[in-house]
Amino acid sequence: MAIQWPTWSAIAPTLVLGLTALLLFVVDSISPDSTNRGLLSGIATVGSLVALGITGWFLSAGTGNETITLYNGALVVDTMSLFFVLIFTSVTALVSVASYDYLRDHAYQAEYYALVVLAATGMTLMASANSLAVVFVSLELASLPSYALVAILKKNRGSVEAGLKYFLIGALSSAIFAYGISLVYGVTGSLRLPQVASALAGSGWESVSGVLGVGVLMVLGGFAFKTASVPFHFWAPEAYEGAPAPVSAFLSSASKAAGFALAFRVFVEGFPLGAAASAGIDWALLFQILAVATMVLGNFAAATQEKVKRMLAYSSIGHAGYVLIGLAALSAEASTNGDVMGAAMAHLLVYGFMNTGAFLFVAMAENWGVGRRF
């Protein structure tokens, strides 16, 4: 007889990551001055691998073939969310392993690993968010630990300065994003993406189409920050250069993929192109402009850099433009949208691992004494 698992078990990878972060905090509370990097790195790595294994099992068993809805529609688990969770957990495990030697004799190791796992927890929630409220909370859960991770090298002025700039730009983008959500809620009367889409499919939007358009534009700005897309890309070169190399790898791959997971979910499910166009909002055109600007600026700027981290940062911005093509190429006819989204997701998968490898090689060079040392 088949085992009937409870519905909440569909978010088991998220729960495992959350429990792993709590365990790291417990270890830190018992031994605040602990530098047992083997234990700390092992806990973070094992927790990430367990979450990765559960996600792979779900995908192989076809768990996401039929959408699973949890908590009254606030979260959904489907193939797309599991695909992105697979990326997040894989990158988290790689970063945790790479940090073992990189953080030798460095303080705040327990906090470092806990912040990495907490950020990954927020990213898994971002992939499953089906409500604008959950979208905002999960985005902040992923962003707040990232600010601290960038500035964790307290004795390094570049790290602290990069973390401060990242935080200030992130706070501004969060405020813009939250205000955009409030405008969308005020017009549609709902925060859940299916209800927002149903409201947009109705009629009588002429008097409030401007307010709704501004709200959608502000929401798009929040995603542009998270994915380091033009014109919200200014934080990326500073943050990637000042942060520890494993953190740069984490931000450039997992964090960027999380931003696109949210964008795919919100704009495809919450603001369907056909319904949005009938309300006078052509967000595909906005993504087309963003894609062109991001690709051009990112790649041309990368070609002029003399520092490896800044070059990789601008290259990461350029790759964000490539993925934006996936949103820019969507049409009101849904027959080809699946192929377009699949291509964008495949690019994120390959890019995520390749860019993680590039930054981890930089971490090895720094650890060997070629670059910065603690």
Which residue ranges define each predicted feature?
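Alpha-helical transmembrane segments of multi-pass membrane proteins predominantly involved
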Residues: 1-374
